[in-house]
Amino acid sequence: MRLGSKLYNFKFILLFVSLVAATGCYKFDSSQTVPAYISVDGINLDTYYPEEGTNSADIVDIWVYVDDGLIGVFEFPESDSLPATLPIIAEGKHKLEIRPGIKLNGISSTRVPYPYYKPIIFEEFDFIPGTVQALGELTTSYYPDVIFGWLEDFEQPEISIESASWSDTAIIRTQPENNPDAFLSSNSRYSGVIDLLSDKDEYGGTSHNSFEMQTPGTVIMLEMNFKTNNYLTLGVLIRDTYDIIEKDLLILNHSDEWKKIYINLGSNLSLYPQAIDYKIIFRAGLESELSDAHILIDNIKIVYR
């Protein structure tokens, strides 16, 4: 199974001049008519597993900068194909920067460079018009100062998600080891699974630990993988001095393949500057047209700087 390790043959998304002006200005010779081309085979995420979790990622596009000016956003398609080529009007040595991009909250219209993946930088890239210069497969990693507030990959028997008092069922590990339903990789042999049945049709669970609030404006991201035939709601339980506030963030749609999602927690938590801490909550009810449901999740991370 491949998820986020190779992404090929993307299309060029043109940006408005106003966006370029807002992010920097790249100056080039207006008389140049023949572009230089670079080809990219894909982008891999490299992690130090004990501290950063698995290397699952869903890098859907790249943000390309020349001399700190945004050139454009180049989208990877769903299917694998030949290495992609991008035209750039540049000649000679320039700084080339490639930032890995994601779909924020899983929405195609909210694409952003992921702030916790390091950009790939070539300080003096020699652009040669009329040629294709192959960069091959690129590799990114988390910034060294990224903080991992929560890591749950279900590889240990103890699970850091506890059932709510009203829940009919609990999340458990897939069995046996390397069950084909699980998210399988070099560091992943198990996943978390929630089974709903007609007589056990409601699930609720929260992270065992509470997480400290950060300075308002801090970008706090929840990463996770999922595969499900039943809707799963993700939210936060926010505790302040007097009350606990439950706030839904989004609903995960059905998917018969493993998907990766990046959820912006910070924008929601910043609405409660007096809050003390928060937990992540998971909720699901058996859909009326189903006799049973199978909800799988894995590689949960809370990350911030």
Please identify what each model-predicted range represents.
Residues 90-109:
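A short, solvent-exposed beta-strand micro-motif common in secreted/extracellular proteins
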Residues 103-137:
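Structured interaction patches on ligand/partner-binding surfaces of diverse proteins
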Residues 136-170, 294-295:
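Extracellular carbohydrate-recognition regions
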Residues 21-24:
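C-terminal motif of bacterial Sec signal peptides marking the signal peptidase cleavage site
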Residues 154, 207-232, 263, 300:
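Extra-cytoplasmic beta-strand recognition segments
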Residues 286-303:
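Extracellular carbohydrate recognition
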Residues 242-275, 290-291:
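Extracellular carbohydrate recognition and processing domains
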Residues 169-205:
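Short carbohydrate-recognition loop motifs
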